[in-house]
Amino acid sequence: MRLLISCILILSILVNFISGHAVLVAPTPFSTNPSKTKLCGGGTKQTVAQITWCPNSSKTNRATWKIVVGDGAGAVTFKLATNGGTTEGDFTTTLTSKVLSGSDPKEVGTYYMDVRVPTGTTCTGTNGICTLQAYTESSGWYSCSAIKLDSSACDKAAEETALVEYNVQVKDNVKFCDQVVNKVVLLPAGTQLGEYDQRTQGVFKNNMANPLVIGQNSSQCGNLYEKVLCDVSFPLAPGSDGKPIYQVTQKQCEDFIEVCDVVSHVELYPCSIYGDGNGSNLIIIPTLLIISILSLILMF
């Protein structure tokens, strides 16, 4: 499970190659880039709810917080602006939250949190939305997301909003990262495969054009970077031994660093993780078995 989370963590580093180091992942925030900009981490304010939560203090809602680099550590506080605002005075409701791992985020990794909304809370903002704020008081990272509150969400288990497997079988769904077609991948619940694939392609194009990210943007570099980026953007479900299944080898990752001249940022690309997993070309795991394994993972 740690290796799986590490794989997903790399996605954040590659997609958000900036100085920020902690960010809300789910519900989808105004900005997917980690930021210390008060009070919502920058980005564009959403006018449509990203998710519907349960307004009942006896029920839990799932949020996902990610620390990309160590300076993003610290307890995460959740507040709610029921009027949909984003100013200091709007965030009047502090929500109760608990990290599933049992301790506050202290190191690089992905953290799932159960968040409770006081019973009877209603959203009065435009389109019936509230603004959810998540921030670390000790290290000062901020994120916000537009959400709705409705009792219909109270019947859904919080676990459903953690990780969900997708059986990618239709090629039209994933065109850029077509290496995952007909594969079972793990992505946050609610992810639209086509949109996610397009966003990954956009990240690829932007980074290839940015010399601060990719030092040598040759065609050989592009081929290597595409494989690495798609592998971490669409992590495959783990094998029967619990280890992640990678579609990139450690050698390919190291070649990417060298050919693309990203040696100065080598700490952001832990190629050693590829030596701990299984190559997808060597192991074929039945879909039913993968889903069973995933179900066990989500229990812990």
UniProtKB/Swiss-Prot annotation:
It is found in: Membrane. GO terms for cellular component: membrane; phagocytic vesicle. Glycans are attached at N56, N217, N278. Keywords: Glycoprotein, Membrane, Signal, Transmembrane, Transmembrane helix. InterPro entries: Frizzled_dom_sf (IPR036790). Residues 21-279 are extracellular. Residues 1-20 form the signal peptide. It is a single-pass type I membrane protein. The chain crosses the membrane at residues 280-300. Gene3D superfamilies: Frizzled cysteine-rich domain. The keyword Nucleus does not apply. It comes from the Eukaryota. This is Uncharacterized transmembrane protein DDB_G0281067. It comes from Dictyostelium discoideum (Social amoeba).
